[in-house]
């Protein structure tokens, strides 16, 4: 049995018009700014330059260690300065439209972000996957996707826009709010707090969109998430998943340095061209070369290769042999993901016996190849089926959302 909380009311045309007007008057958010950007913003707002370094340190602590979302809660900052900050900036959380809790503990949030410029409000989902000893948050980087992977439900939704670094981080901050994962902070009304201990230990960029097609905003968000003076997530607990944007894979290794996951799904170019069409631009030889050259690879820092199991498509023993040959010499883990059907798809999940044979061969060749147990199916939060309908705001009703989320995630 799953639990669902509808946390908003239906939008009307008048409400949408108010959203549009508000977007033109929106104050910039301090969340998602680099220290350099925050310094420039504070100086422009009137903070004396000699105080800026100290003020950034204070703000960073309140935003990312204490998790406050109201300047009034920043108790070691003067009342006058708090008023000035509130006049010029915002640190508000996005609207939580809906929260769903699966019978297996998986949680899914539908977040609404305000419009950018003349655009409409957009909605995206984040999924929290609890496991023994860790909790993983699956984060989106775009609204929609451009990649049109044939087996993926998200690929049937056109790209609406990129998310900003603020919106990427807001998913993490709001999830921590609702899980009671900030110290000495009251949880929001209606939040259902799980057992004690740090709730979010890992994040994976495996939600909606291709993170490397939004490189600069994703980079900024992940560097803030891994900053030791704030959210302080180890880069070994942050995994970025890509379908194979080869030039940005090199940049990811050089400029971000987080764990890498590759949505592989096929070991022959002619098949991968169909399943993952970006392969036509960056074929397997180029992709695997970039993986081999990813900085710092070792048995402790492996690349995760994601492989969805499609019946009679990519699940033969010959495919397993080619997979082992393709990855030879790369420190790697191979996540085998049973396909989750969605309305309109022509693909089927491989038989369980065939998945196990495939896994046994890959394991015998020396590669860890766990078969991912689907999580959150009862709340539409399982592998490869995330799809927001936020680009189709109904005329007088709130947005409907149908979504599933990749459950394979990093260590």
Curated annotation (Swiss-Prot):
A single GO molecular function term of this UniProt record: 4 iron, 4 sulfur cluster binding
UniProt miscellaneous comment: Reaction proceeds by a ping-pong mechanism involving intermediate methylation of a conserved cysteine residue.
Active site: 125, 383
Binding site for [4Fe-4S] cluster: 145, 149, 152
Chain sites annotated for binding S-adenosyl-L-methionine: 209-210, 241, 263-265, 340
Organism placement in taxonomy: Bacteria, Pseudomonadati, Pseudomonadota, Alphaproteobacteria, Hyphomicrobiales
PANTHER family in the record: 23S RRNA METHYLTRANSFERASE, RADICAL SAM CORE DOMAIN-CONTAINING PROTEIN
EC number(s) given by UniProt: 2.1.1.192
Required cofactor names: [4Fe-4S] cluster
Keyword field: 4Fe-4S, Cytoplasm, Disulfide bond, Iron, Iron-sulfur, Metal-binding, Methyltransferase, rRNA processing, S-adenosyl-L-methionine, Transferase, tRNA processing
Species: Brucella canis (strain ATCC 23365 / NCTC 10854 / RM-666)
Role played: Specifically methylates position 2 of adenine 2503 in 23S rRNA and position 2 of adenine 37 in tRNAs. m2A2503 modification seems to play a crucial role in the proofreading step occurring at the peptidyl transferase center and thus would serve to optimize ribosomal fidelity.
Keyword 4Fe-4S: yes
PROSITE patterns, sorted: RADICAL_SAM
A Pfam family hit: RlmN_N
Disulfide linkage: 138-383
InterPro entries xref list: Aldolase_TIM, Methyltransferase_A, RlmN_N, RNA_MTrfase_RlmN, rRNA_lsu_MTrfase_RlmN/Cfr, rSAM
Subcellular location: Cytoplasm
Any one cellular-component term (Gene Ontology): cytoplasm
GO biological process: rRNA base methylation; tRNA methylation
UniProt-recorded name of the protein: Dual-specificity RNA methyltransferase RlmN
Cofactor info, note text: Binds 1 [4Fe-4S] cluster. The cluster is coordinated with 3 cysteines and an exchangeable S-adenosyl-L-methionine.
